[in-house]
Structure formats: structure tokens, C-alpha cells
């Protein structure tokens, strides 16, 4: 038995998820902690997702702040649990993705794991994606192997859907290797559009989207992006799907009500997921949803409408809190690294072979 911490900061940049887990024969979630992202740090990280001046210094300063925030959250969680740093074997830190371009041979996550190890007194495992990219893979998604470990006993033909900033599927079938890929935008465009139009960080329960009407012309234009035509392995990020991308499409179409654009973006998220699933897996028994999208009632309802033959439910219905699956995954990835266990899946990322992921920063 060993304790691990997983730290996850996704493309939504809303905050840091920290999970304390116990790794034995099975993985058990013991405690969680959430720290909101300071608005100025969020803006700095968002700015680093596209080209700009003085990027190296800006990235270095931002990752120091990210590590300091993560360190503070870890100290708070350990204090609440009455644990000393030496009780934890390692921290699995995803860091913050600022660029992801595997076709050009690189992916960049920042978070200064050396500083995080120094601040916490706990060994840190980080930089999980680059080894897979070095082996010719997409570097994403990395969670399908964890989903397989966590959920494979629940059925013969399952799909695990993570909806964060982007959506990705893990396809689990008995006696077959796990498959997985990114489907497209999850919450990233929904969040960006409502933030620009109303100043809200996200569309609570999808209520604003539900007040609008999806526009077929806009949806067709968005779905014509080449990314959606490809089959997995594939991954994507803010480099492709962002507000300028949406604005370019809107500029060529009639003016729409803002809520109708939001409704169309929700339909884009739902359709890209179900279309991707239909291409890759037939006879899906259940679609289990985790990530922020599991809390979006309008999205969950639409997924159920588009996939009537399967059970569509939050992972919470199966005893796994949907908000903490990814943080748990990076705790598990740290365990795999320290034990020398390969944690990528070539059937997911198209890497040349199995690889041990992560770099170790001793306490």
C-alpha cells in the first residue's frame, strides 16, 4: 500500500484538482482538494497558448506560480488529513498544457516539478506526455489505460467519456486492447463564448445553451473542420479550437443570437462525441461520463438522445466521482512510473510501443 497525490489542471484553466489516493490491489480515493486558479495566472496561462512576445520568460514565471499554487494546495490537503510529506510516496503532476502539436513532434506542459518537489518535500513525477510523443505517439489521451483499470469490470462493451476543455473517449471491450482518442471541443468553446458574451466562466448546467436553438448552417460549417473527419488515434487542443476559429466561421454566416451560438456549440460537442463513438465502437452498452461535462445537464440529456440504445450516466452512478477521475489518473501514472510500468497504449496514441511515462524529481 502506498499513498500518492495527483494534481490536474485542465484546458479549462478553472483551477487545480488534487486527489489523495491509496494504491494497493485497487486504487482508492481518500481525499480531495480544489484550488481556484487566480484570474491573473489564468490569463497568463491562456496567453501562453498562442504565440506572443517574450514567451520563455513568461512561461518560466507562470510555471513557478503554478507550482507554488499546487504546493500550497498539497500542504492544505495534507494538514487536513493529518499527514506528513514523508507519508506520500510521490506526486503525479500533469502541469498545464500550453502547446500540444504532436504532428510537429512536441507537446509542452509547464508546472516546474523541481520547485514543487522543493516546496512539498515529496518526490514529483511529471512530464508524462513527451515520452509518448518521442515514440511517435499523440501524447494524448493518457487516461484510457487508467479508465481500463478502473472500469473494465463493469461491462463487455463500454465507453468512458471525459469532457473537460476537450472531450476524449476510452473504448473498453472484453478481450481487446483499450482504444481512445480526442473527439473535439468539450467545454472549451462553450466556456469561451459565455465568458465573452456574459462574463461567466462557464454555462452552469448548460442552461444558456438550452435557452437557444442549434443552427444547422453554423453546425455544418463547424463540423466541416478536417479534425472531425479523421479517425483515432488523434488529439487536439487550443491550437485548433478557440474563439478566433469560431469567429472565422461566424464572419461567413448570417448573424445569430448569442444563445443560439451557444446551443450550436453544445450540439457540436455532443455530435462530435457520438459520431466518433459510432465510427469506433458498435453496440456500446454504456457511456460513462466524467469531467466537468458530467455536471452539464443539457449536454448529458443530448448525449442520451443521440445514443438511445446505451445507458448514458455519470461515473458517479458507479461510485467514482466524475470531478476527480483525471487527478486520480495522474496519481496512478506516478505509481506506474516509479514501478516501471508502461502506461501509454499504442492502440490509443499510435506510439511505436509501450513506454514508461514521466520524469522523476526526487524530494
Swiss-Prot record:
Disruption phenotype: Cells lacking this gene accumulate anhMurNAc and are fosfomycin sensitive, in contrast to wild-type P.putida, which is resistant to fosfomycin. It comes from the Bacteria. Keywords: Antibiotic resistance, ATP-binding, Carbohydrate metabolism, Kinase, Nucleotide-binding, Transferase. InterPro entries: Anhydro_N_Ac-Mur_kinase, ATPase_NBD. It is an enzyme of class 2 (transferase). One of its GO terms (biological process) is 1,6-anhydro-N-acetyl-beta-muramic acid catabolic process. One of its GO terms (molecular function) is phosphotransferase activity, alcohol group as acceptor. It catalyses: 1,6-anhydro-N-acetyl-beta-muramate + ATP + H2O = N-acetyl-D-muramate 6-phosphate + ADP + H(+). Pathway: Amino-sugar metabolism; 1,6-anhydro-N-acetylmuramate degradation; Cell wall biogenesis; peptidoglycan recycling. Its EC number is 2.7.1.170. The keyword tRNA-binding does not apply. ATP binds at residues 10-17. Belongs to the anhydro-N-acetylmuramic acid kinase family. Catalyzes the specific phosphorylation of 1,6-anhydro-N-acetylmuramic acid (anhMurNAc) with the simultaneous cleavage of the 1,6-anhydro ring, generating MurNAc-6-P. Is required for the utilization of anhMurNAc either imported from the medium or derived from its own cell wall murein, and thus plays a role in cell wall recycling. Contributes to intrinsic fosfomycin resistance in P.putida. This is Anhydro-N-acetylmuramic acid kinase. The gene is anmK.
